[in-house]
């Protein structure tokens, strides 16, 4: 295990506790609200202003027409090392990565385009580090596909070459689609991703096929009051077209949204492990921890 992995595993508990204490700092106001839900914004609400439930759900919505700046650190200190069906020992994946994601919305009369760039810097168990396959994605949402409380969209996805020690040094291409909806304190949806080329060598062993596994990410968030929420996190299930096998993680996310006049901050901690992986011929994380901060800002 790399020095970074050992250090991350040793400090994860303290960092998680510090984050949860920080999130709890703003909960005193929520106590006064009682059964009335989250406290009202500091500034007087204008007529027709969105409710606190809607404002929180919007901060969680990656398909909303708003600027988004995300920074995240994910630590994967240990993996399952059982014997796979092909007789080989299950390999480890990356030990940790830093992620930066930016969304820059383009609003037109008949549609909205959400260009999104995701950069990740990985480190593996051998101590090797470098940039992963940067993703450039453009979600296209026609106005007719937006029904107010939710929307659906689809768009092209391109992956750039990464450092060969931690990623594939080649281009990839594909598409992604999303469908989301909010109802009161609930926010839920489904994301799909399908790419070709640039197959992650730690996810599945390289084969003659250029087809990556299909990514399916259902998500569900519920508001707890006072800006707090709980959800299942980035639970990306994968289906391998070649072996017909499925990998399914499971996790829990606890976060808090701070709604401000010009935008919102979303801070969360997430834990994840592997639920279905026995027939999967790739890595399967045993314990994964993510610390995230995101700032969203409506256009205009």
Where are these predicted regions, by residue range?
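N-terminal secretory signal peptides that target proteins for export/translocation
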Residues: 1-11
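Hydrophobic alpha-helical segments, especially transmembrane helices
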Residues: 7-8, 15, 257
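Transmembrane beta-barrel domains of Gram-negative outer membranes and organellar outer membranes
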Residues: 32-300
């Amino acid at each position: 295990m790399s020095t970074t992995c050992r250090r991350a595993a040793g400090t994860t508990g303290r960092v998680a506790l510090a984050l949860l204490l920080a999130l709890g700092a703003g909960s005193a106001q929520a106590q006064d609200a009682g059964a009335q839900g989250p406290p009202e914004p500091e500034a007087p609400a204008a007529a027709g202003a969105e409710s606190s439930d809607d404002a929180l759900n919007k901060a969680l919505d990656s398909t909303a027409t708003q600027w988004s700046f995300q920074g995240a650190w994910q630590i994967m200190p240990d993996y399952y090392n059982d014997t796979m069906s092909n007789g080989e020992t299950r390999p480890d994946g990356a030990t940790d990565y830093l992620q930066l994601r930016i969304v820059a919305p383009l609003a037109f009369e008949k549609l909205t385009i959400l260009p999104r760039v995701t950069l990740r810097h990985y480190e593996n168990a051998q101590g090797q580090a470098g940039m992963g396959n940067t993703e450039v994605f453009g979600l296209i949402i026609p106005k007719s596909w937006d029904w107010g409380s939710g929307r659906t969209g689809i768009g092209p996805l391109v992956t750039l070459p990464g450092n060969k020690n931690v990623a594939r040094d080649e281009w990839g291409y594909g598409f992604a689609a999303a469908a989301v909806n909010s109802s009161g304190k609930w926010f839920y949806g489904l994301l799909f991703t399908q790419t070709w080329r640039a197959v992650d060598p730690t996810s599945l062993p390289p084969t003659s096929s250029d087809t990556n596994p299909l990514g399916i990410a259902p998500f569900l968030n519920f508001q707890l009051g006072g800006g707090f929420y709980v959800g299942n996190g980035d639970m990306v299930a994968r289906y391998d077209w070649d072996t017909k096998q499925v990998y399914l993680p499971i996790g829990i996310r606890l976060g808090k949204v701070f709604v401000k006049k010009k935008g919102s901050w979303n801070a969360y901690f997430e834990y994840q492990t592997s639920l279905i992986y026995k027939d999967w011929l790739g890595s399967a994380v045993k314990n994964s921890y993510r610390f995230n901060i995101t700032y969203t800002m409506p256009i205009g």
